[in-house]
Amino acid sequence: MAFHNRRWNFTFSCCVVVLLLPLVAARPQQPSAATRVHEEYSTFRVENTEWTFNHLAVDHRNGNVYLGAVNRIYKLSPGLDIQVSHQTGPDEDNRNCYPPRIVQPCSEPLTLTNNVNKMLLMDYRENRLLACGSLYQGICKLLRLDDLFKLGEPFHKKEHYLSGVNESGSVFGVIVSYGDASPDKLFVATAVDGRPEYFPTISSRKLTRNSEEDGMFAYVFHDEFVASMIKIPSDTFTVVPDFDIYYVYGFSSGNFVYFLTLQPEMGGGPTTGSSSAGREQVYTSKLVRLCKDDTAFNSYVEVPLGCVKGGVEYRLLQAAYLSKAGTILARSLGIGPDDDILYAVFSKGQKRRPKESSQESALCVFTLKEINERIKDRLQSCYKGEGTLDLAWLKVKDISCSSALLTIDDNFCGLDMNAPLGVSEMVRGIPLFSESKDKMTSVIAYVYKNHSLAFVGTRGGRLKKIRVDGPTYGALQYETIQVVDNGPILRDMAFSSDQHFLYVMSESQLTRVPVEACEQYSSCNECLGSGDPHCGWCVLHSMCTRKEKCERSSEPRRFASNIKQCVRLSVHPNNISVSQYSVMLVLEAHNVPELSAGVNCTFEDLAEMDGLVEGNRITCSSPAEKEVPRIIVDQGDHQIVQLYLKSKETGLAFANTSFVFYNCSVHKSCLSCVGSPYQCHWCKYRHTCTHDPSSCSFQEGRVKQPEECPQLLPADRILVPVNVVKPITLRAKNLPQPQSGQRGYECVLTIQGVEQRVPALRFNSSSVQCQNTSYMYDGMEMSSLPVDLTVIWNGDFSIDNPAQNKVHLYKCDARRESCGLCLKADPLFGCVWCKGENRCSLKQHCSYPQSMWLEHNGINSKCTHPRITKITPLRGPREGGTLVTIRGENLGLEFSEIKDHVKVADVECTPVPEGYIPAEQIVCEMGKAERSQFAGNVQVCVGECRPEFMAKSSKYYYFVIPQLLSLKPSRGPISGGTIVNITGGNLDAGSNVSIMFKDQKCTYQRRGGQWITCRSHASMQGYGNVSVSVYVDKAHIHKDLKFEYVEDPTITKLEPEWSIFSGNTPLTVSGTNLDIIHTPLIRAKYKNLETINICQVLSPTTMQCMAPELPYSISKHKDVPERPDEFGFILDNVQSVLALNNTNFVYYPNPVFEPLSVSGVQELKPGSPIILKGRNFLPPTPGGNGKLNYTVLIGDKPCALTVSDTQLLCESPNLTGRHKVLARVGGIEFSPGVVHITSDSPLSSTAVISIAGAGGLLIFFIVIVLIAYKRKSRESDLTLKRLQMQMDNLESRVALECKEAFAELQTDIHELTSDLDGAGIPFLDYRTYTMRVLFPGIEEHPVLRDLEVPGYRQEQVEKGLKLFGQLINNKVFLLSFIRTLESQRGFSMRDRGNVASLIMTVLQSKLEYATDVLKHLLSDLIDKNLESKNHPKLLLRRTESVAEKMLTNWFTFLLYKFLKECAGEPLFSLFCAIKQQMEKGPIDSITGEARYSLSEDKLIRQQIDYKTLVVNCMHPDNEKSPEVQVKVLNCDTVSQVKEKILDAIYKNVPYSHRPKASDMDLEWRQGRVVRVILQDEDVTTKIEADWKRLNMLSHYQVTDNAVVALVPKQVTAYNSVNNSTVSRTSASKYENMIKYTGSPDSLRSRTPMITPDLESGVKVWHLVKNHEHGDQKEGDRGSKMVSEIYLTRLLATKGTLQKFVDDLFETIFSTAHRGSALPLAIKYMFDFLDEQADKHNIHDPHVRHTWKSNCLPLRFWVNVIKNPQFVFDIHKSSITDACLSVVAQTFMDSCSTSEHRLGKDSPSNKLLYAKDIPSYKSWVERYYSDISKMPAISDQDMNAYLAEQSRMHMNEFNTMSSLSEIYSYIGKYTEEIVSALEQDDGARKQRLAYKLEQVVAFMSLES
């Protein structure tokens, strides 16, 4: 082929490249095929986005292409290279200027107007092109075809103005020839755009030979009565104001000219009158016919066209094309092959929506013959006087037909009577093909080898190729290709002159597409099965092509054109074993041409050999031994290899078949061996599988059939109770008898991963028994455990178990804590409820007589004492219908037992069989309650209502009345998808809720007590209001709520239409109705990945969006722009904007920055500009105005920028020193390095010289002195040298330390963020969390336990406490009680905190009341604070009152959800980051000091050499699981290593659920035998002087990649601690002591370990000897270094952790973060403080700020930050604690309003964050200001929220125990409290003192 030598520069459509990739890969030996398709696709794109393409014409004589566009006409070569272009616009114009301004001046304002090309016609006779535009009322140019030279442009007469309409697709012209003698005529039809008086809608014009002649475009005939034109009467516009006729296609055939139109219907249907009344206009498609010779247009006839497929009407014409029928289609239609047929594309229905939402369309075919017959029939009936003229738009009123005696033949051209005429009955086309996803928009067709082929363009830019064989055979869509990037494809399509190519056009590109792409099919079946009539199979070249392109295709069987002619190949034998070599194979080939040139046989890439051809048989041999494929166990037992026949003539494979190599020895069981499809035999006694029967004799037990295999037979469930000795007998067949030297049978049971082997006995060939043994499994979580059972013999020969029999081990008492659950167990288990022991056990294990048993079907089979544990819901409507779920114990075993025995609040509740779980759960449906019923408990009787069979709930079920208040938003799009929030009361009652918008459901989503949300559906009723009602079970709640469906939002414009790959550039979006969408999103889809970004609505017509990023890894991008596959918006459910068709959105490559310099540091003088180099800084947008919004920060100061494509010039701000440079653009942030700005020397040259001179003199003087000194003393000289060396040494180490610190800072940040992967966050449950905050350090607090009172006093005490509880719930009493306690001297700070916490535990279930009391107490506190003339800022600073601790507790209760959903994550990340960063360096296990620290006190100030090791640790729970790699340091103590290993293995396990390091020993495993236990102290521990150093890994010389294991602690004295040292018992005692103090610090942070051992006086150390022991000898000073130098490490650590600290602060100090709204409690309390400040006339913002800071950040957050163990299940070490304290201090400083003056003497932790605190302060101020701007929370909303919180945590604490604890204070201060109550008026009225005395009496009464 000659193609691949040329170079082509065409831009190809992407889809073709994709299409071809598999092809190129599959057949590399034929590059030309791919190249050819590549070069056949060529594309011409718009030069300017405004100059969109309109029309297309191809010169069929030479193939040149003419393209009409906005403002341009182009002449292109057949390959779409541009040859000439002719400019047609833009020009000054106004559409209202008639006649246009080029004829006479116009008073309208003129603007530069584009010229749309509306018509492009080839006038072959005169070799010219007619190009009509939209400028100047639609004048036309005549251009010479060769060079587009303008031959003429008539514009001065009114017939020169075709129409002012500026749509390109509503005008059509047909040039008609009348033989050589007469000139041609032009029939032109156009839409008139509401100006019927100026423009005829259809007319015939003269085409003069001379293009400049006066008569050009004159009407063919014109006098005062008649003209060759038709105008639309103005009356028509009074009926349908926007009436117009749109012309879609036109052609001439025979004696007639035809036009296809789309026009509004005039009928008296619903559309009569103004279409603006909201009704949609109905359209109809019609064909118009005129005689060619008719000058008066009497022959005008109109016929409606349409198409019906599958009951769906398609009536809106989109495109049409006239073609010949072709033999096959003609035969099917009953016409001649050369008859004309008309293809037409219609879309569904008759309503033309602005952006037609329906994508459904159909391709239909009409025969012209039938249309003409139908017109002839109508003409005949009309001239008989039947019916009316039926042309409503032209005649407006009905006119009857007049009769006349005429013969009407096929060519009748009408008279001036009965004309023009309309046919009322629609001509139905034959539907060929329909499409519902991608609307068809254009069609063209031709006949190839008798086949009719239609090519259809679609809205999505695709081309469908359809073979049309007619109604009997149907239509086959055989290929679809993506031709243009952005659809739709326009109506004009054209074939090249040789019909090998098709020109397809969208508004922005014209593409040449080959009509066939046969090369894409790589096999004969694919090629001939494709349905493309162009394609056939060229056999020996093994390619799909047209016949004329296949060499010697006329010879027999060399070219296949039918799928039956494809080559078929078979081989015998078609499989062999891998151990057989060079076997002769016979291949039989069918449909092959003669193969005289010879063939080769090829086994893929294994082997190739000559084949011997005899007729159609070919003989080959199989591969030799070294070429046979190796088959390994993983691949199965065989490998399929393709066997190819290669022609020696072409060198190509032309036929292939599958050949199998199999390997029997892969099979390890008899059944799989003999069940293999290959010849495999099983050797029973050798337990092997072979293909060779001779290698396994009959004596060796050869097996061929599955029935003969040794195997276990299916058994019923094998049940074995645990710990019961029992044999297991199994049925089998063909069990082999072990031969001499072979071992006997065993059963292998794998229980929880552990293998248990049991000897077994073979009774005979059909039975085997596992001997008496008992079995056991761990845990009580499973009541039964299926266990795999394998029977083996001779050690490892397993017997097949095809039924996969399992042994079921079971425990009666597991998961059967109640009688009901016990009796529910499988009867075969034999479990009984042992009443005496109150447990479920086997009969034989119950030590009581049988009368004390309950068993399933025994005499006693009914459980007593049913119990109800839970009821949901607890509230419902009176109307009933609520499904109440009752959970409990012993709730019957049969449904019949409880069927009629359930009452809820005294209302019958009918149990539902489906919801019944025996013994555990009843679901019943509530009946209707009376008005008088309000609440009651739930009562269930089992069988009979005797006390022992009856259960009553402790909780009540309440009847409530749900109510509706309002809904928001009250309107949404007609397409639905709006999230509607309905507010009201009691909306969480009942079990089922549904929301109706009139007759339509609104999909329920969530609900709470006062709200329900649902998602609206698309409206069925159209626009307007619908009433909203809610059903809660059977209650129908109705209020006059309305939801309005309004028109869907539309998107009209995007600016700009580009972004960069990383997105996040601002876009302005214009459209309509945008404000009805609450959360609009913008989306992009690329390569099946989707990204979204947010939008903000600014007004109903505009919104601002951030561009989504291109969803594709940036690294895969070359530097080329990309277009997303889809780009659009998610606006609720509005489908029309999901993927915009009218946008050309482009993504340009991201800007790329280069580093500032190789070292990353650039030296600069002040004022010098900083130049950032790179590329893509200015996106190459079409208008060239693509600007990105860059920000460049030097340090934290922005700089002014000048941007070019490769440089950013930054005017550096007035700074000196080192500063990081940071560039931001879109979604990218990049730091090209650091600038170092050094200031110039301020000294003058004279000063410099004089200083230098003075310096010189000084040096001279020093030298003299030194010489003198040297002479004086040699000794001091030596000392000096020694000092000098030490100084050098010190200096180099300082430098090294600084350099290390810097390097660590740079690398650690990255490592840390990548290491902290999303481990689950171990949140504590609500109860544990609140207890840790309320009662810190107390593990088992009484409020968690039941009240402990001696039995004889219990009733008395409970009565007393209930009374006391009522008093606590009395506000007067409670306030008086608290005030009295606070006024007592003995009432300590600790007591205050305790009382506040106890009161809050009692009031947990009544938070509204608690809040009210708290507000009173706080108000008192503020009054007291201001009265005592304290500084108002001190308010709430310290916990000196009950109120302050109550406030902390209040926040503790109400911020749990916020912690869990929002703030917990960054807090946990910070904790993990600190822990991880600390552990990367050495930590002294005794002093708690660390190399990495935020706290100066906990910083190791020495240089410690250490190395990181990786140890491989066995999993303690499962040694078989893979080893875990753990990073440790060689200077870690053994305990530290154990902790690190536990952290790694139990990474996602909460701390309390892990094994403790102290319970485990660390074993170092060296090889299989040697195991050394490593310990902190043992006999090998080194003791120097009186210091003993703990053992580290380096002490044991543990190597990198050593294998270690954690094993439970050994009791033996194996390398145990020497007695003279700190013994293990004393250490563990010490650990226990710490455990109960509740302190978070680790054992190591305590100094006691350093105190010398009393007996031996030995002190223990690890890395540094404690500073207090200043016993280092003077000689050691040489190794010391200035300790302050190590403070740089604080900075390194701070830098590493900065991101985590920022994240935490940002979360806490933002009003809406991570999807969680601001907790109501914060807003409510801040508003309360503001009210109090207003009340006391405090207007100082600092005071208000301080109150808020003291109230929330200091009271709650600081506590949580310092003590993350209050929130998470974790362990906090002393070094972590020290770092968190620094963070907490920074947090406190950020909340303060006072300025901190810092100097070099300030503490390091203040200096560390000094630079960050100002920005944190601004966050805090913004946070407080945002909160104050938020709308106030009403008391009603707050109370609802508090009630909800109370309900959620109702039973967390034991109220009785709490009351008892509070009562202890009453006992202590009885007299004082009673007297305070007697003095208070309110208390006297309520006789509270008397009531308290009653309580005291009850509590002290000794009965």
Curated annotation (Swiss-Prot):
Kindly list the GO molecular function terms attached to this UniProt entry: semaphorin receptor activity
- InterPro entries reported in the protein's UniProt record: Ig-like_fold (IPR013783), Ig_E-set (IPR014756), IPT_dom (IPR002909), Plexin (IPR031148), Plexin_cytoplasmic_RasGAP_dom (IPR013548), Plexin_RBD (IPR046800), Plexin_repeat (IPR002165), PSI (IPR016201)
Q: Which Gene Ontology CC terms are recorded?
A: membrane; plasma membrane; semaphorin receptor complex
Q: Which residues are glycosylated?
A: N166, N450, N575, N600, N656, N663, N764, N772, N981, N992, N1025, N1141, N1189, N1214
> Which residues point to the Cytoplasmic side?
1268-1903
According to the record, the signal peptide region is 1-26
Can you tell me where the transmembrane regions are? 1247-1267
On the tree of life, the source organism's domain of life is: Eukaryota
User: Which cysteines form disulfides?
Assistant: C97-C106, C132-C140, C291-C413, C307-C364, C382-C401, C518-C535, C524-C566, C527-C544, C538-C550, C601-C620
What are the entry keywords?
Cell membrane, Developmental protein, Disulfide bond, Glycoprotein, Membrane, Receptor, Repeat, Signal, Transmembrane, Transmembrane helix
Instruction: Identify the residues that the record assigns to the IPT/TIG domain, covering every copy.
Output: 866-960, 962-1046, 1049-1148, 1151-1246
Q: Which residues form the PSI domain?
A: 517-567, 663-710, 811-864
State the membrane topology: Single-pass type I membrane protein
| Function per UniProt | Involved in the development of primary sensory neurons especially in branching of the peripheral axons. Interacts with the SLIT2 signaling specifically to promote axonal branching of Rohon-Beard neurons and the trigeminal sensory ganglion neurons.
Protein family: Belongs to the plexin family.
Q: What is this protein called in UniProt?
A: Plexin-A4
Record the organism: Danio rerio
